[in-house]
């Protein structure tokens, strides 16, 4: 989990979670990011819909745990809207492997 785009690499603003995870783990990782204050209504901006962000990340985690053919999922960016307005994956790449659960 991290700041989107090249900022993730430039700033090193990332958090790594090992599956399985619980929603509280995802939320804690988000809150450890340098960009976390932006989700709290920084300088008058709307508070971010962290529930939706956590739900999106949990859905990706569930997919990874339940489908042996999935190798990696990258969403960049996951755009987090204002409180109660959701989150949307603007772009995603999914890498598949040859493992069919053997």
PLM segments and residue spans:
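ATP-dependent carboxylate/acyl-activation modules
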Residues: 1-102
